[in-house]
């Protein structure tokens, strides 16, 4: 669902920001 996509994007952003 859309929320799953949002969580996936958030995870990628989290990894990239570290």
Curated annotation (Swiss-Prot):
Keyword Transport: no
Regions that span the bilayer: none
Disulfide bonds: none
Subcellular location, record wording: Secreted
InterPro entries found in the cross-reference section: Aurein_antimicrobial_peptide (IPR013157)
Tissue: Expressed by the dorsal and submental skin glands.
Record carries keyword Secreted: yes
Keywords from the named record: Amphibian defense peptide, Secreted
One GO cellular component term: extracellular region
GO biological process, one term: defense response
Principal location listed in the UniProt entry: secreted
Name of this protein: Citropin-1.1.4
Source organism (scientific name): Ranoidea citropa (Australian Blue Mountains tree frog)
Lineage: Eukaryota, Metazoa, Chordata, Craniata, Vertebrata
């Amino acid at each position: 669902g859309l929320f799953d996509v949002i969580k996936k994007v958030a995870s990628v952003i989290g990894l990239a920001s570290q």
